[in-house]
Amino acid sequence: MAHLLEKTRKITSILKRSEEQLQDELPYNAITRQLADIIHCNACIINSKGRLLGYFMRYKTNTDRVEQFFQTKIFPDDYVQGANMIYETEANLPVEHDMSIFPVESRDDFPDGLTTIAPIHVSGIRLGSLIIWRNDKKFEDEDLVLVEIASTVVGIQLLNFQREEDEKNIRRRTAVTMAVNTLSYSELRAVSAILGELNGNEGQLTASVIADRIGITRSVIVNALRKLESAGIIESRSLGMKGTYLKVLISDIFEEVKKRDY
C-alpha cells in the first residue's frame, strides 16, 4: 500500500506544473516520461483530434511508419475515432486488436505486446486518450489504478490549460476590437489597404504609395500604424528609402477589419 501511495503522489504532483511548463510544443512529454518510469511502459497522450501532446518510449516497439506518427505529432483518423469511442479504460489489448498501438508489420516481433487505453474526460468533456503499452508484460490491477488516476490528473490539467487558452483568446480579441474602435474612418481604410499589401502576416510597404492609391495623406497611415503598434497588434521597423517592414502579431486584426467592411 505504501508503495502504491508513493506512486500516486508522484502522479498527482503533475498538478503542480505551471502554465509556463505547458507551453512547449509537446507540453506533456515530462508527464508521460514520469508515468512511463512509474509503470514501466511506453506512454503517450493524444487529444480528441489526434494531436500528440506528449510521449515517452522506454522500449522500442514501433516501425519507421509508426515512428512517423510521433514525428508529425498526429495520429491516423481511424485510430483516433476508435480511441474516442472508448469510454472506460480498455486494458491489455492484444496485438491482434484493432486498437493495439503495435503496428501490423511488427506484430510477429512482439506477439505478446499489450496496449491499454484510458479515456481522458472531465465534466463530461472528452479531452483525449492516455495510451500505454508494453512488449510482453501484463498490466496488473495496481498499474491500472495508477493509469486511472493519471488520466484524471491529466484531464484536470488539460481542462485548466484549455480554459487559460480560451481566456487568452478572449483578451486578445478584445484588445483587437478596442484598438480598431479607436481608428477613424480614414485610418480604417488605411489599415485595410496595409493588410492587403502583406504577404501573410508580414511584409514590406511604402506608406506614400498606399496613401496615393486610396486618396489619403501619409500621416493618416502613420497614425493608424502607431495606434495598432501601441496596442501590441503589430510591430514595424523603418527600412529607410525602401519603406517600412510590418509584422502582424495578433492575426485577429484581419477578421476584425474585414467585419468593418473597409
From Swiss-Prot:
<feature type="region of interest" description="GAF domain">
    <location>
        <begin position="1"/>
        <end position="159"/>
    </location>
</feature>
<comment type="similarity">
    <text>Belongs to the CodY family.</text>
</comment>
<dbReference type="InterPro" id="IPR036390">
    <property type="entry name" value="WH_DNA-bd_sf"/>
</dbReference>
<dbReference type="InterPro" id="IPR013198">
    <property type="entry name" value="GTP_trans_reg_CodY_C"/>
</dbReference>
<keyword id="KW-0805">Transcription regulation</keyword>
<dbReference type="InterPro" id="IPR036388">
    <property type="entry name" value="WH-like_DNA-bd_sf"/>
</dbReference>
<dbReference type="GO" id="GO:0003700">
    <property type="term" value="F:DNA-binding transcription factor activity"/>
</dbReference>
<keyword id="KW-0238">DNA-binding</keyword>
<dbReference type="InterPro" id="IPR029016">
    <property type="entry name" value="GAF-like_dom_sf"/>
</dbReference>
<keyword id="KW-0804">Transcription</keyword>
<dbReference type="InterPro" id="IPR010312">
    <property type="entry name" value="Transc_reg_CodY_N"/>
</dbReference>
<dbReference type="GO" id="GO:0045892">
    <property type="term" value="P:negative regulation of DNA-templated transcription"/>
</dbReference>
<comment type="function">
    <text>DNA-binding global transcriptional regulator which is involved in the adaptive response to starvation and acts by directly or indirectly controlling the expression of numerous genes in response to nutrient availability. During rapid exponential growth, CodY is highly active and represses genes whose products allow adaptation to nutrient depletion.</text>
</comment>
<keyword id="KW-0678">Repressor</keyword>
<dbReference type="Pfam" id="PF06018">
    <property type="entry name" value="CodY"/>
</dbReference>
<dbReference type="GO" id="GO:0005525">
    <property type="term" value="F:GTP binding"/>
</dbReference>
<comment type="function">
    <text>Target genes are mainly involved in amino acid metabolism, biosynthesis and uptake, but also several other cellular processes, such as carbon metabolism and iron uptake. Binds to a 15-bp recognition site, the CodY-box. Additionally, in pathogenic bacteria, CodY also regulates virulence gene expression and provides a regulatory link between metabolism and pathogenesis.</text>
</comment>
<dbReference type="InterPro" id="IPR014154">
    <property type="entry name" value="CodY"/>
</dbReference>
<dbReference type="InterPro" id="IPR011991">
    <property type="entry name" value="ArsR-like_HTH"/>
</dbReference>
<feature type="DNA-binding region" description="H-T-H motif">
    <location>
        <begin position="207"/>
        <end position="226"/>
    </location>
</feature>
<dbReference type="GO" id="GO:0003677">
    <property type="term" value="F:DNA binding"/>
</dbReference>
<keyword id="KW-0963">Cytoplasm</keyword>
<protein>
    <recommendedName>
        <fullName>Global transcriptional regulator CodY</fullName>
    </recommendedName>
</protein>
<dbReference type="Pfam" id="PF08222">
    <property type="entry name" value="HTH_CodY"/>
</dbReference>
<dbReference type="GO" id="GO:0005737">
    <property type="term" value="C:cytoplasm"/>
</dbReference>
